[in-house]
UniProtKB/Swiss-Prot annotation:
A GO term from the CC aspect: microtubule
GO annotation, biological process: microtubule-based process
Organism of origin: Glossina morsitans morsitans (Savannah tsetse fly)
Protein name according to UniProt: Tubulin beta-1 chain
Region annotation (Disordered) ranges: 427-447
Keyword terms: Cytoplasm, Cytoskeleton, GTP-binding, Magnesium, Metal-binding, Microtubule, Nucleotide-binding
SMART domains listed in its UniProt record: Tubulin (SM00864), Tubulin_C (SM00865)
Coiled-coil residue windows: none
A GO molecular-function annotation: structural constituent of cytoskeleton
Highest rank taxon of the organism: Eukaryota
Biased segments, Acidic residues type: 429-447
UniProt binding sites for Mg(2+): E69
Localization in the cell: Cytoplasm, Cytoskeleton
Residues bound to GTP: Q11, E69, S138, G142, T143, G144, N204, N226
Length: 447
């Protein structure tokens, strides 16, 4: 069986991760003690992707929980599914990273990283055929961003041919915990560009807007935001957890989604977005789902896909529905909005259908888009970064942990390069390539 090792780092990562395990345990019929009470063989057919089987027929999440302070881990442990995790897989420090990337990456985190890698190694060794790793973390804090990226690069060293997948919560000015978020995020993106195969960008700003506008919640809590994130994660991983044809493992997903190695930052979306109480009042049709799923209001990253073009798209439909209708609707969307899809990747939209809907819904759809509009998100962080870095504000917190200003400059230019790469492919057309090749040939002849 193709296993995935799940790692959650920092406060945000652990809270989202805990929600994720609650939701998928529920979908697979596993209760808070790890016992199976399901009603369908499909629930167990690929259970090994995320769970180890322990003695007595219990299922234990293949999860490693990491933090530099004990607080969040304690609340996960005392939460509804706290007893399902393997106690040895909680690895935490006492000092905290104080929202400082340098502490997470170079000092405090570096001290803890070996004990985390021991646990990861133990999980990886007990796998039959490991397909890769997934990390949930935020980019705005210290542990998830600094230590999370440190773990990624260490795991990359040890398992260079395994897929590395992250669910990264990107900071936003509207929902800010700390003033140094732009620094932490830029330093993290610098790492993610080089060391991950797939990164789902989840954006607090977009989540807030969804809670506010669509779900009509007047004061959204982090609990509400995390609920949305876990819906999305459950949807994105459907193909991995239930038998199906398309994108059935992390590598196939990467092959379909990533046209150029650096451009692997995806915009997730979900439909239908209904507030927690009102699901049962109406059933959606496939056309409505498709329409909603491509709508900018349903994106979990605060970028408007209409400001860019899609390089690739994967869509996952869940529930009992007609495959034919799904294909028709997806083609329909592409034909109507053909200008929003690059024409130099034909058939760049892939669709999967899974029979098992999420709890409380008859059918749902999850959207994964690799759109050039994601550059808006990086631009936003970059502007805030530059504003502070120009004055060297707050820099002493980082240099005090042994960092060099050069590293900031490098991270900044790497992120700006990423933005220009997205821009370049947004403007590229199928005809330009021919001209470009002619130019190159001419240059070769001159030389």
């Amino acid at each position: 069986m193709r296993e995935i090792v799940h790692i959650q780092a920092g406060q945000c990562g652990n809270q989202i991760g805990a929600k994720f395990w609650e939701i998928i345990s529920d979908e697979h019929g596993i209760d808070a003690t790890g016992a199976y009470h399901g009603d369908s063989d499909l629930q167990l057919e690929r259970i090994n992707v995320y769970y180890n089987e322990a003695s007595g027929g219990k299922y234990v999440p293949r999860a490693v929980l990491v933090d530099l302070e004990p607080g969040t881990m304690d609340s996960v442990r005392s939460g509804p599914f706290g007893q399902i995790f393997r106690p040895d897989n909680f690895v935490f420090g006492q000092s905290g990273a104080g929202n400082n990337w340098a502490k997470g990456h170079y000092t405090e985190g570096a001290e803890l990283v070996d004990s985390v890698l021991d646990v990861v190694r133990k999980e990886a060794e007990s796998c039959d055929c490991l397909q890769g790793f997934q990390l949930t973390h935020s980019l705005g804090g210290g542990t998830g961003s600094g230590m999370g990226t440190l773990l990624i690069s260490k795991i990359r060293e040890e398992y260079p041919d395994r897929i590395m997948n992250t669910y990264s919560v990107v900071p936003s000015p509207k929902v800010s915990d700390t003033v140094v978020e732009p620094y932490n995020a830029t330093l993290s993106v610098h790492q993610l560009v080089e060391n991950t195969d797939e990164t789902y960008c989840i954006d607090n700003e977009a989540l807030y807007d969804i809670c506010f506008r669509t779900l009509k919640l007047t004061t959204p809590t982090y609990g509400d935001l995390n609920h949305l994130v876990s819906l999305t994660m459950s949807g994105v991983t459907t193909c991995l957890r239930f038998p199906g044809q398309l994108n059935a493992d992390l590598r196939k997903l990467a092959v379909n989604m990533v046209p150029f190695p650096r451009l692997h930052f995806f915009m997730p979306g979900f439909a239908p977005l209904t507030s927690r109480g009102s699901q049962q009042y109406r059933a959606l049709t496939v056309p409505e789902l498709t329409q909603q799923m491509f709508d900018a209001k349903n994106m979990m990253a605060a970028c408007d896909p209409r400001h860019g073009r899609y390089l690739t798209v994967a869509a996952i439909f869940r529930g009992r529905m007609s495959m034919k209708e799904v294909d028709e609707q997806m083609l329909n969307i592409q034909n109507k909005n053909s200008s929003y899809f690059v024409e130099w990747i034909p058939n760049n939209v892939k669709t999967a259908v899974c029979d098992i809907p999420p709890r409380g819904l008859k059918m749902s759809a999850t959207f994964i888009g690799n759109s050039t509009a994601i550059q808006e998100l990086f631009k936003r962080i970059s502007e805030q970064f530059t504003a502070m870095f120009r004055r060297k504000a707050f820099l002493h917190w980082y240099t005090g942990e042994g960092m060099d200003e050069m590293e900031f400059t490098e991270a900044e230019s790497n992120m700006n390069d990423l933005v220009s790469e997205y821009q370049q492919y947004q403007e590229a057309t199928a005809d330009e390539d021919a001209e470009f090749e002619e130019e190159q040939e001419a240059e070769v002849e001159e030389n």
